[in-house]
UniProtKB/Swiss-Prot annotation:
Localization, UniProt: Cytoplasm
Lineage: Bacteria, Pseudomonadati, Campylobacterota, Epsilonproteobacteria, Nautiliales
Keyword Nucleus: no
Protein name in the entry: Chaperonin GroEL
UniProt source species: Nautilia profundicola (strain ATCC BAA-1463 / DSM 18972 / AmH)
InterPro entries xrefs: Chaperonin_Cpn60_CS, Cpn60/GroEL, Cpn60/GroEL/TCP-1, GroEL-like_apical_dom_sf, GROEL-like_equatorial_sf, TCP-1-like_intermed_sf
GO biological process, one term: protein refolding
Family indicated by similarity: Belongs to the chaperonin (HSP60) family.
SUPFAM superfamilies linked to this entry: GroEL apical domain-like, GroEL equatorial domain-like, GroEL-intermediate domain like
Keyword hit for Nucleotide-binding: yes
Gene (UniProt): groEL
Catalysed reaction, written as an equation: ATP + H2O + a folded polypeptide = ADP + phosphate + an unfolded polypeptide
List of residues binding ATP: 30-33, 51, 87-91, 416, 479-481, 495
Source taxon at top rank: Bacteria
Record EC number: 5.6.1.7
Keyword annotations from UniProtKB, A to Z: ATP-binding, Chaperone, Cytoplasm, Isomerase, Nucleotide-binding
Length: 545
């Protein structure tokens, strides 16, 4: 086991602070509309240019072991804030540094760290309650665009693109970000339910130019086993012909042999307008997705587990959809004729499963199912001239998207660091002793850090800006882009309440942990022996010198 080094009390805390400062100094320059870029070296390829706080934080590893521990803890604040709220990483880092630095003065002067931490926790609770009072719900597409624009470093085009995507697929819809193939940003919306299974035979296509099968006003048969025998399908097909021969989409585990051949022949002869695809997913997820399609289209899954055979299927078991489009790789069901109440109940059930699951993979798959049921999928394709620019832009779009979802979830407050500053000014906290009051004061002081940093990056005097905003009315803040004091809601400078809340909670959580640290244990690097000098033998003639 490697030897360990231990440092105590003030020495440990000061070394931790040095590490936190190094990380915070690199991250804070990106803050606000006039924030600067940071250049990150890559082990291969071109350097990465970013204005995204969490990307900068992730790159930082310090040589000094105790300093590095401090930096890693604050890096955790940035990552956790990004994971939970999608944005606010720079705010969280700046706050964590401010809490630790401010608190260290009092701890060094003899305050009790545990009592100080209690006071800090009380202050955070009070500020969050105040933020919730200040919060307004997002009412229109324009506000969504404003939130997204700010998160994308004031890129209006990205803001408008995200607002349009949200508008098209609804707040539960899935919006994904991909690297585009052109210079322009593009939005592609898939309405209805789409799954990644294409037709089983190209003979099913109805449009040979586009190579797609389009079925209008179609019936949908859902079966959870393989279909290989035609006689199982015949009773149902006969009923369909008698009922007016509507188009039919068959979704089953697989369709092969005689059954597939017969369907293809009947399709080519014009007897049936039919298309067959495999069911999406595997195992239990396949059953769940078939059930989703059944609810969306108002049909039943024919399953032997439920005592049903394919031969017993009737027209009443079939789902219906206004339009089905099947290409080589995907099937899209638009305008499913399912019962609205049943669809809502299924959506609520999936939301509950998302809350309860502990697996990230399961959560992602459940969210995909939720989106497919509740509106559709939008894909934002990011365009740029170079790969470096593409990556930087994609970072910003991802940030903006997460912040927008957070705004829809918990509402919005004024931006520019003004919301937590004003919320802290209005709080009153019951404290039990002087040290708890110190904890409250530390947080009240620390919440000025974000607005001061935004002002500093824009070239204004930080102290004066913070004081003026604190004294102004509740909606007035500082527009760092123009240098004016404005009504932030009217100017469209807004932040999601969730982002502010989570940034503050995480920052104070780690800041107070660092303050209550009394010792730091690190590994002592082993001294590796210097490599031996190479043998000089064979150098004939050297003795003549």
């Amino acid at each position: 086991m490697a030897a360990k080094d231990v440092v105590y009390s003030d020495v440990a805390r000061n070394e931790l602070l040095a590490g936190v400062e190094k990380l915070a100094d690199a991250v804070r320059v990106t803050m606000g509309p006039k924030g600067r870029n940071v250049l990150l070296q890559r082990s291969f390829g071109a350097p990465h240019i970013t204005k995204d706080g969490v990307s900068v934080a992730k790159e930082i590893e310090l040589k000094h072991p105790v300093e590095n521990m401090g930096a890693q803890l604050v890096k955790e604040v940035a990552s956790k804030t990004a994971d939970e709220a999608g944005d606010g990483t720079t705010t969280a880092t700046v706050l964590a540094h401010a809490v630790f630095k401010e608190g260290l003065k009092y701890i060094t002067a003899g305050a009790n760290p545990v009592a100080v931490k209690r006071g800090m926790d009380k202050a955070v609770e009070a500020i969050i309650a105040e933020l919730k009072k200040m919060s307004k719900t997002v009412e229109n597409k324009e506000q969504i665009a404003q939130v997204a624009t700010i998160s994308a470093n004031n890129d209006k085009k990205i803001g408008e693109l995200i607002a349009e995507a949200m508008d098209k697929v609804g707040k539960d819809g899935v919006i994904t970000v991909e690297e585009g193939k052109s210079l322009q940003d593009e939005l592609e919306v898939v309405e209805g339910m789409q799954f990644d299974r294409g037709y089983l035979s190209p003979y099913f296509v109805t449009d040979t130019e586009k190579m797609v099968a389009e079925l209008n006003d179609a019936y949908i048969l859902l079966y959870d086993k393989k279909i290989s025998n035609m006689k199982d399908l015949l009773p149902l097909l006969e009923q369909m012909v008698q009922a007016g021969n509507k188009p039919l989409l068959i979704i089953a585990e697989d369709i092969e042999g005689e059954a597939l051949a017969t369907l293809v022949v009947n399709k080519l002869r014009g007897v049936l307008n039919v298309c067959a695809v495999k069911a999406p997913g595997f195992g239990d997820r396949r059953k769940a997705m078939l059930q989703d399609i059944a609810i969306l289209t108002g049909g039943q899954v024919i399953s032997e587990e439920l005592g049903r055979t394919l031969e017993s299927a009737t027209l009443a078991d079939l789902g219906q959809a206004g339009r089905v489009v099947v290409d080589k790789e995907n099937t899209t069901i638009v305008d499913g004729r399912g019962d609205k109440a049943a669809i809502e109940a299924r959506i609520a059930q999936i939301k509950k499963e998302i809350e309860e699951t502990t697996s990230d993979y399961d959560r992602e798959k459940l969210q995909e199912r939720l989106a497919k049921l509740s509106g559709g999928v939008a894909v934002i394709k990011v365009g740029a001239a170079t790969e470096t620019e593409m990556k930087e832009k994609k970072d910003r779009v991802d940030d903006a998207l997460s912040a927008t979802k957070a705004a829809v979830e918990e509402g919005i407050v004024i931006g520019g660091g003004a919301a937590i500053l004003k919320a802290a000014k209005n709080i009153s906290v019951n404290v039990e002793d002087a040290d708890e009051k110190i904890g409250v004061d530390i947080v009240k002081q620390a919440v000025k850090a974000p607005i001061k940093q935004i002002a500093k990056n824009a070239g204004f005097e930080p102290g004066i800006v913070a004081m003026k905003v604190e004294e102004a009315d509740e909606n007035t803040g500082f527009n760092a882009a123009t240098g004016e004091y404005v009504d932030m809601f009217k100017a469209g400078i807004i932040d999601p309440t969730k982002v502010e809340r989570i940034a503050l909670q995480n920052a104070v959580s780690v800041g107070s942990l660092l303050l209550t640290t009394e010792a730091a244990v690190t590994e002592v690097p082993e001294d590796k022996p210097a490599p031996a000098a190479p043998d000089m033998g064979g150098m004939g003639g050297m003795g003549m010198m």
